[in-house]
């Protein structure tokens, strides 16, 4: 996935001088041992580095200030090995502007009844120290994450790893730049929003560029590059001409590849990580980008149709959380309301992300009833089965809300010979009726990001970091 730097996390262990140098030495050794084992576990997507034992307000504050100014540090993990007077943490914690995880753990996972004494108690009093430390975080009204359990347990490691992905996404969010080629679809409400507030809250920069600026890039692509990509993609996808003659099919597919290479070069040259198109404004383009948009999403770029910059940025954000695994721009289209079959069929005109494909996508060319352009090439496939989340962001004037529900993904019950697009079937775990009523009541949009790799706990953590309301429909 393009343009995600190598991040790391710092580990700061709480203690105090009261216990003497030998105990502090042991605290550091234990901390380094835990970090070594965590890094070796294979459950963490980013490495942890030991930073310091926090024993005074001064050295804790210095560590947090250094974390702020080290761009390679995505967050800080803390643990109170011994008792750690929480007043020492106040200033440093106030200054920290990186994500914070409090790991409430213990060096050993048991109580050594046959050998325990007060020396052991002084060294291993995380149950005591973590409460003191957690209090000051609560008192400061922090949006920090708490993970409780033994550090060697896989479930704890997985939870830390998922939080790491959220923390990195939070840091990267302030680098997300969205280009809108033309404005949003005319007269549509939910795709609109306050771009200034979005930049304040999420760090998203949203810029308008005319389609003519894009056309210049598209027309400048070398034919040889298109020909090479056309051959390369035949190993990845099935090329199905169908009712098209071979000349038309090849031309229309290659034009989408021209658009793909042109848009990608534009995004790369100007530092954008997400984009939108609008079928109402395609002057100078032969086709609405379909296959082109799908290939760019597969590369990790965010996308949404009809100028929906919020969903384009959200899709990019969740692709960072998920490492671009099974995370796609989506739209609710039509319903199955029969008892025992309740489901939503999600799709879009063309642009569904192939990272959720369950079968080998087919490159097909078919007419498109809107846009007034040539028949666009697109990837056609069925989505996957399994647990997923469907997520949207809506702007209510006084606040943004992150809205989601858990869903069960399924494949369509039958083929759709007259609907040659990629599609995904799902049912809200709350039930179609309760899920739909909840979504409609809170004002969730019709454009979403559907992810089989992100969960509601991570969405909760994201909302907490950004300081926005999270509505999890159950």
From Swiss-Prot:
Cofactor: how and how many bound: Binds 1 Mn(2+) ion per subunit.
Enzyme class: isomerase
GO MF terms, alphabetically ordered: L-arabinose isomerase activity; manganese ion binding
GO biological process: L-arabinose catabolic process to xylulose 5-phosphate
SUPFAM superfamilies registered for this protein in UniProt: FucI/AraA C-terminal domain-like, FucI/AraA N-terminal and middle domains
Superkingdom of origin: Bacteria
NCBIfam families associated with the record: PRK02929.1 (NF002795)
Family per record: Belongs to the arabinose isomerase family.
Protein name: L-arabinose isomerase
